[in-house]
């Protein structure tokens, strides 16, 4: 007799939900470990609980190395998608430029009607405003990504500074113990200030 199928839906009882989360998380991590061993692959698992607690596990390489490789590959895929999107955006502009060029290369360019020229001018202005709007949007996205990188670097800087402070404190404690007659009332050395 096999297991009965469990309907996949949200578990209403909070304690049952927590127990199920814990068991399934451990099962998922175990399966990832098995996949890594059997297939000799690098596997990283990141799970965030409903309460916001982070669980991660990696086998083979360090989890940060695996994520870095993923980001590099994903960035290449995003660049390819971005190029396809740009091509799709430029096709109407290309057609418009070809229309303008054909109008201007007509043998009787002086006989082109005013309405036709006004229409071409409006199309060019529309294309130009769309291009400028897209450029502004891309610049804002770039600025936001730089702000996010700055935030991450500041956080990393704080972590490193606090680690340096702990290491400096440990080193001075060790030095105090090495010298006879040193008092415990020595001044604690200052840590390096954070970069602003």
Swiss-Prot record:
Induction of synthesis: Slightly repressed by vernalization. Negatively regulated at the chromatin level by VIL1 through the photoperiod and vernalization pathways. Requires EARLY FLOWERING 7 (ELF7) and ELF8 to be expressed. Up-regulated by HUA2.
Compartments (UniProt record): Nucleus
UniProt keyword terms in alphabetical order: Developmental protein, DNA-binding, Flowering, Nucleus, Transcription, Transcription regulation
GO biological process assignments: flower development; photoperiodism, flowering; regulation of DNA-templated transcription; regulation of flower development
Principal localisation: nucleus
Tissue: Expressed in most plant tissues, embryo, seedlings, roots, leaves, stems, inflorescence, pollen, siliques and flowers.
Domain K-box: 80-170
Effect of deleting the gene: Suppress the late-flowering phenotype of photoperiod-pathway mutants. Affects natural variation in flowering behavior in both long and short days.
InterPro entries documented for this protein: MADS-box/MEF2_TF, TF_Kbox, TF_MADSbox, TF_MADSbox_sf
Gene Ontology molecular function terms on file: DNA binding; DNA-binding transcription factor activity; protein dimerization activity
Domain of life assignment: Eukaryota
Region Disordered: start-end pairs: 175-196
Domain MADS-box, chain residue ranges per copy: 1-61
GO cellular component: nucleus
PROSITE patterns (alphabetical): K_BOX (PS51297), MADS_BOX_2 (PS50066)
Described function: Probable transcription factor involved in the negative regulation of flowering time in both long and short days, probably through the photoperiodic and vernalization pathways. Prevents premature flowering.
PANTHER family in alphabetical order: SERUM RESPONSE FACTOR HOMOLOG
Additional information: The early flowering of cv. Nd-1 (especially in short days) is due to a deletion of AGL27. This deletion is associated with the QTL 'FLOWERING 1' (FLW1).
The protein's assembly and partners: Interacts with AGL39, AGL97 and AGL74.
Designated name of the protein: Agamous-like MADS-box protein AGL27
Organism (species): Arabidopsis thaliana
Lineage of the species this protein comes from: Eukaryota, Viridiplantae, Streptophyta, Embryophyta, Tracheophyta
Gene: AGL27
């Amino acid at each position: 007799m096999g297991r009965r199928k469990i309907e996949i839906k949200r578990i209403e009882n909070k304690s049952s939900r927590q127990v199920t989360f814990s068991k399934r998380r451990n099962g998922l991590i175990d399966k990832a470990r098995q996949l890594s061993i059997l297939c000799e692959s690098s596997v990283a698992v990141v799970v965030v609980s409903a309460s916001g607690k982070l669980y991660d596990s990696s086998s083979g390489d360090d989890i940060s190395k695996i994520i870095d490789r993923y980001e590099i590959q994903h960035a290449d895929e995003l660049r390819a998608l971005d190029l396809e999107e740009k091509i799709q955006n430029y096709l109407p502009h290309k057609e418009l430029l070809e229309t303008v060029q054909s109008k201007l290369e007509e043998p009787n360019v002086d006989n082109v009607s005013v309405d036709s020229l006004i229409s071409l001018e409006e199309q060019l202005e529309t294309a130009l405003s769309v291009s400028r709007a897209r450029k502004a949007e891309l610049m804002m996205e770039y600025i936001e990504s730089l702000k996010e990188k700055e935030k991450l670097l500041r956080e990393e800087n704080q972590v490193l500074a606090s680690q340096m402070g702990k290491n400096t404190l440990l080193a001075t404690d060790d030095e105090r113990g090495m010298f006879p007659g040193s008092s415990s009332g020595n001044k604690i050395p200052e840590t390096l200030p954070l970069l602003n």
